[in-house]
A protein has these predicted regions:
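Aromatic-lined carbohydrate-binding surfaces of glycoside hydrolases
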Residues: 1-50, 63, 68-73
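A structural motif corresponding to the C-terminal end of an alpha-helix
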Residues: 1-3, 48-61, 85-94, 141-147, ...
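Structural preference for beta-strand elements that scaffold enzyme active sites
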Residues: 2-8, 60-66, 93-97, 117-119, ...
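Short catalytic/ligand-binding loop motif for oxyanion handling, primarily in non-cytosolic enzymes
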Residues: 14-17, 73-75, 105-107, 158-160
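Well-ordered, non-membrane alpha-helical segments in soluble/globular domains
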Residues: 27-51, 77-87, 129-138, 160-174, ...
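Glutamate identity and glutamate-enriched acidic tracts
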Residues: 29, 35, 50, 61, ...
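Extracellular glycoside hydrolase catalytic/binding regions
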Residues: 41-44, 68, 72, 78-81, ...
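Substrate-binding cleft of secreted/luminal carbohydrate-active enzymes
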Residues: 103-105, 117-195
Length: 195
């Protein structure tokens, strides 16, 4: 058995105008230019895949790439860039997936951006004032949009009953609203959990 892992792909921020030279032409890439962003992503993917190949991991396997930003602005540049990243990952035999926050900008267009999979976060577990209805609403949205779900656990769930009960609501919601079957699950474990 090999544990499958995904590498994050970060958004080349347009305000980064001196990224560095990634293609050996002696000119630093400018992230405010689409063509330079395309070069940066190509360089990053090639570097990641080369490292992965040379490492010859025995027990882990690169399964794909993860778009790190949890929301997408509606600009034409974002649309072009994310589609280009999805195309570049597909050309290399990998998928690109996304985990947006609850009802984030871009959620309803996730497939148009080229993501193979998108798993929405209900964002219920971390804030005690977030209503339980987020769980059902998230389940309804992911069904309607053909998405998947992220199940989250707070580090406080191990020491504070209120956070533990919130985590259990995710699990119960999966039974009540059907996302425990026939749906991909992503899991977010707060970095403070299990320390």
């Amino acid at each position: 058995y090999k544990f499958k892992y995904y590498l994050s792909v970060y958004y080349p921020r347009p305000d980064t105008t001196n990224f560095g030279d990634v293609d050996g032409d002696g000119v630093s890439e400018d992230c405010s230019k689409f063509e330079d962003c395309r070069k940066i992503i190509k360089w990053y993917l090639d570097l990641a895949l080369e490292y992965n190949k040379n490492a010859a991991f025995k027990n882990i396997e690169l399964a794909g790439f993860y778009w790190f930003d949890e929301a997408i602005d509606s600009s034409e540049n974002s649309y072009k860039l994310i589609n280009n990243i999805a195309d570049q990952t597909k050309e290399r035999g990998y998928d690109l997936f996304w985990i947006p926050y609850y009802c984030a900008p871009g959620v309803s267009e996730w497939a148009e951006y080229g993501f193979a999979t998108a798993c929405m976060q209900p964002n219920y577990v971390f804030n005690l004032t977030t209503p339980l209805s987020n769980i059902k609403n998230a389940a309804d949205i992911i069904k309607r949009l053909g998405m998947c779900i992220e199940i989250e656990i707070s580090g406080d769930a191990l020491s504070k009953d209120a956070y533990y009960r919130r985590y259990l609501e995710y699990l119960k919601g999966g039974i009540y609203y059907g996302y425990m079957k026939d749906c991909i699950h992503m899991y977010y474990q707060d970095t403070l959990a299990y320390n």
